[in-house]
Amino acid sequence: MSLKVIILAAGKGTRMRSNLPKVLQPLAQKPLLSHVISTAQKLTNEPIITVIGHGAQRVVDVIGTDGIQYAEQLEQLGTGHAVVQGNPHYNDDDTVLILYGDVPLTQQNTLTDLLNLVDDIHPLALLTITLDNPSGYGRIVRNQHHLVQAIVEEKDASFEQKAVQEVNTGMMAVKGYYLKKWLGQLSNSNAQGEYYLTDIIEMCVQDGFEVHTTQPASEMEVLGVNNKSQLQSLERQYQAQLAEELMEQGVTVLDASRIDIRGDLTVGQDVTLDVNVIFEGTVVLEDHVSIGPNCVIKNAVIKSGTEIKSFSHIEDAQIGQNCEIGPYARLRPGTELSTGVKIGNFVETKKVQIGSGSKVNHLSYIGDTEMGAGVNIGAGTITCNYDGVNKHQTVIGDNVFIGSDSQLVAPVTIESDATIGAGSTITKDAPAGTLTLSRSKQLSIKGWQKPTKN
């Protein structure tokens, strides 16, 4: 006896007006289906049974096969028919939890409450919700004793039934033996000509069982996505929830409606986030980190006391303590900064290691470089790392001073305590403790006449 989860993910999603299958549409840059699978995997170590149909191979390619058993629904004949495709993957004594690939935000504790309602004498339990506007949902029909009798789809509902505000979310937990039994009794004699999974509720009652129900804490947990408008609305609700969770952890969020978390964000104490900040992938912000407005941070670790100023883009980078980045800085993959480094406006770095206290303050490109501590890089300095075919390394020792508008043509080494004169193009190694420069001799031509316009 174990828990098996079936996720229905075969729908086309015509109203999305997209070539991408509906369950692969992104919520916080993660496919809708991936959200559901992640929650399911918190409930069981068993493979997640995922019923696919439209765009099946694309779904497999994106989601992968790790911890998942796929079942294909070749014809779209209704939710009951979809669940039948999962029958070979569970046993009679299993409890089967049925979820939907386009309902991404159901919480683990809500599903645990649902599962706790199922036992040998209560083989079926439903997740329902009461809505002010139940239009479009199947209605929960109860008798005078408030016991569930059936679910009636809106297209088949009477006028009185349409007035019911308690609706079906689609999610249920069922004992495997009874699920197979009732699925085998389904008929498609309805307005849609489909096999409704919801018809098994009436069968359960007819077999003498009570159907127990529970409800989620929030309507957002059971919201499905059928079009881009609903997807955008759910995105904003989800981001608001994530912002609220950050503030509960002590983060100062200057405007909760203008922050996007599109991955996993870990924060320390006294973190401050300004407006229009986007986090992607896996990001760690340690204590006393400040992120200015309009920054994009992806797959980065930012250590304590560091300030990221406005309009900075950081990707696949490790930033040390008490650094100062930006504004308008771009730290590309492979950037590793030690303590107290300053990267200023319009500076781009890639595949660099920069030592403690070094400064690259203005208008520079530093790539494929090992830089020591206490280095000052003047404005307009470029490491010329690419010869048209291969990338080459620049090595800069400790306490080096690079004058403005210099070009370091790799491969080249600037040894510790060296000084490079402004405007130099360095093609050979610069010795330690020396001044190295390469400039044309300055000339002042007397009697020079400025050209005049013809």
Curated annotation (Swiss-Prot):
- Give the stretches traversing the membrane: none
Q: Which GO terms fall under molecular function for this chain's record? A: glucosamine-1-phosphate N-acetyltransferase activity; magnesium ion binding; UDP-N-acetylglucosamine diphosphorylase activity
Q: Name one GO cellular component term.
A: membrane
Q: Please tell me where this protein is predominantly located.
A: cytoplasm
Cytoplasm among the record's keywords?
A: yes
Q: Please give the name of this protein.
A: Bifunctional protein GlmU
Residues annotated as binding UDP-N-acetyl-alpha-D-glucosamine are 8-11, 22, 73, 78-79, 100-102, 138, 153, 168, 226, 332, 350, 365, 376
Output the GO biological process annotations, alphabetical, semicolon-separated.
Answer: cell morphogenesis; cell wall organization; lipid A biosynthetic process; peptidoglycan biosynthetic process; regulation of cell shape; UDP-N-acetylglucosamine biosynthetic process
Cofactor(s) named in the record: Mg(2+)
| Positions of acetyl-CoA binding | A379, N385, Y386, S404, A422, R439
Alphabetical list of Pfam families matching this protein: Hexapep, NTP_transf_3
State the family named in the UniProt similarity comment for this chain.
In the N-terminal section; belongs to the N-acetylglucosamine-1-phosphate uridyltransferase family.
Tell me the enzyme class: transferase
Compartments, as annotated in UniProt: Cytoplasm
Q: Which InterPro entries match?
A: Bifunctional_GlmU, GlmU-like, GlmU_C_LbH, Hexapep, MobA-like_NTP_Trfase, Nucleotide-diphossugar_trans, Trimer_LpxA-like_sf
Question: Which cysteines are cross-linked by disulfides?
Answer: none
Q: Where is this region: Pyrophosphorylase?
A: 1-228
tRNA-binding keyword on record: no
Where, by residue number, does Mg(2+) bind? Answer: D102, N226
Enzyme Commission code(s) on record: 2.7.7.23, 2.3.1.157
Q: What does this protein do?
A: Catalyzes the last two sequential reactions in the de novo biosynthetic pathway for UDP-N-acetylglucosamine (UDP-GlcNAc). The C-terminal domain catalyzes the transfer of acetyl group from acetyl coenzyme A to glucosamine-1-phosphate (GlcN-1-P) to produce N-acetylglucosamine-1-phosphate (GlcNAc-1-P), which is converted into UDP-GlcNAc by the transfer of uridine 5-monophosphate (from uridine 5-triphosphate), a reaction catalyzed by the N-terminal domain.
Keywords, comma-separated and alphabetical: Acyltransferase, Cell shape, Cell wall biogenesis/degradation, Cytoplasm, Magnesium, Metal-binding, Multifunctional enzyme, Nucleotidyltransferase, Peptidoglycan synthesis, Repeat, Transferase
Q: How is the cofactor bound?
A: Binds 1 Mg(2+) ion per subunit.
Residue span of region N-acetyltransferase: 250-454
Q: Which Gene3D superfamilies match?
A: Hexapeptide repeat proteins, Spore Coat Polysaccharide Biosynthesis Protein SpsA, Chain A
Q: Write out the catalysed reaction.
A: alpha-D-glucosamine 1-phosphate + acetyl-CoA = N-acetyl-alpha-D-glucosamine 1-phosphate + CoA + H(+); N-acetyl-alpha-D-glucosamine 1-phosphate + UTP + H(+) = UDP-N-acetyl-alpha-D-glucosamine + diphosphate
